[in-house]
UniProtKB/Swiss-Prot annotation:
Site feature Cleavage, where: 120-121
PANTHER family with a match to the protein in the record: LEXA REPRESSOR, LEXA REPRESSOR-RELATED
SUPFAM superfamilies: LexA/Signal peptidase (SSF51306), Winged helix' DNA-binding domain (SSF46785)
Quaternary structure, from the entry: Homodimer.
Protein name: LexA repressor
CDD domains xref list: S24_LexA-like
Reaction catalysis annotation: Hydrolysis of Ala-|-Gly bond in repressor LexA
Coiled coil (UniProt feature): none
Annotated family: Belongs to the peptidase S24 family.
Keywords for the protein's UniProt record, in alphabetical order: Autocatalytic cleavage, DNA damage, DNA repair, DNA replication, DNA-binding, Hydrolase, Repressor, SOS response, Transcription, Transcription regulation
Pfam family name, one: LexA_DNA_bind
């Protein structure tokens, strides 16, 4: 499923290709969608490419090919399990402890800063400002420094990571193949994906067949942490 802006941009590009034989410029796209900056267009283009609707052709200016148009039929897809631990219930709160251990449990919990939102879908601008904290049992964290990000999007749903989940992240600048990571792309966009190496390149894999794998050179990707657990609100 596309957002309204993604659909509008895809429609505009497709119509321009049919009329003129060349795609519109980023300035024309920005004006057509009434956006303030071209960075918003860049994010929409990336989303359409990830989902397999368009392809950017290398070494050619303004080279965008429309591969398909939206299929209005739905496909929910199977949701498979996710191995890191999940605390379910009220967001940011563990289950009430028994009265005799209430004080001890409260003292043991760790306050983890929430640093903003992370995209499980379209890469979104990375936020570096702490907004609040959530209380996490220490045995869920292990060693190192940790932070939390609110998940936006559905590209990791088949790994059990859902829109609205709070992702618990261990700060790390490296990752092993198969890790689910916070990846910063081009120093401005953050996304939550499964990390793999493909030869000299890095693959950022979604866990949703509606999205495409992104293959990027290492100099465009910086690992900012690894997923170790989830908070989920019902």
């Amino acid at each position: 499923m596309l957002t309204r802006k993604q659909f509008e941009l895809l429609k505009f590009i497709n119509e321009r290709l049919k009329e003129a034989g060349v795609p519109p410029s980023f300035d024309e796209m920005k004006d057509a969608l009434d956006l303030r900056s071209k960075s918003g267009i860049h994010r929409l283009i990336t989303a359409l490419e990830e989902r397999g609707f368009i392809r950017r052709l290398p070494n050619r200016a303004r080279a965008i090919e429309v591969i398909k148009l939206p299929d209005l039929g739905g496909n929910s897809g199977a949701r498979r399990g996710f191995t890191p631990s999940v605390i379910e219930g009220n967001l940011g709160k563990v289950r009430p402890p028994s009265p005799q251990h209430a004080e001890d449990d409260s003292d043991r919990n760790v306050a983890v800063p929430v640093m903003g939102r992370i995209a499980a879908g379209t890469p979104i601008e990375a936020l570096q400002t702490r907004s609040h904290t959530i209380s996490v049992p220490p045995d869920m964290l292990g060693s190192g420094e940790h932070y939390a990000l609110e998940v936006r999007g559905d590209s990791m749903m088949d790994a059990g990571i859902l829109d609205g989940d709070m992702a618990l992240i261990q700060r790390n600048e490296s990752a092993d193949t198969g890790d689910i990571v916070v990846a910063l792309i081009d120093e401005e966009e953050a996304t939550l994906k499964r990390f793999r190496r493909r030869g000299a390149s890095i693959a950022l894999e979604p866990a949703n067949s509606a999205y495409e794998v992104r293959i990027l050179p290492p100099n465009r990707v910086r690992i900012q942490g690894k997923l170790i657990g989830l908070y989920r609100k019902y």
